[in-house]
Amino acid sequence: RRIYPEAIIVHEGHIKNGNVVPSHSHEIVKSLENGKLIMTNQRYVSTPGGWHSWPCSTLTTVLMASDEDIGLILTGTILGATFLQSGIKYWDRFRASSWHGPTGNFWSSAFRLVGVPLFSPVGGSSEFLTMQAALPLIEQNQVVYCMEKDGGACRKCTKCLRRELIRTVIDSQFEPKWDTFDSPSIHAFLEKRPMFMGHIYSYAYSTHSESLPTWMTSRIQDLQKINTDWPMKQLDQSFDFVDEKWRNDLLKKINDFYQSMTIEEFNEMKTWGE
């Protein structure tokens, strides 16, 4: 919404056992002039529920493509997923394009082949950057990332913990509240190696350890160190994976928000997980 305000926003409201799963995001999307809220049971059509593969989350948009004249589907998949295997180890997507097609991902390449390109413009941006761009909306309670407590944030899960950590890094006015996260399940998560989205915790420890509770720092201080600011920079080369027809306009707009990684920063990112 902040970087590409002209884009149509398609959001699925989930139906489970005949009932709508509560989410604060429903009212937010309905209030947007370019918002499309679609109710569907596709995520819970089987038992156990869940996406059968990640492209299923875009199915509604694909079905709407003709009626809405959608020429490109933008997703919000971030750097940790596109290049870092959920923050565990660097994945050379550029090299993978030799066997996964021009996008470096066989699903995205398939979408491109059938004429409805699928691309994440924040695929070269960490969650630090995406939250930084969304901060004005977050302050207006216009961003939903956890729905476990009556459709809103539970402030107990690992996703909520990561959001608290990220905002501590990018928002100097933010006062984090850590008490609800000091639990055996969170401790176990922090101790597990390799660590899910470990680069987020490593960078936060490197730059803001004084703002973190000791029960957290004692469990993440052994993570691989990050010496440059690559988690706070955008990887421009990620736009190599979108068709030239869209590339320049998409990249120009994201560069209005983010600084680009230097070669030194990109090279350090490539060592993550070694």
Q: Language-model segments: which ranges?
A:
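Nucleotide-activated chemistry modules centered on ATP-dependent adenylation/adenylyltransferase
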Residues: 2-274
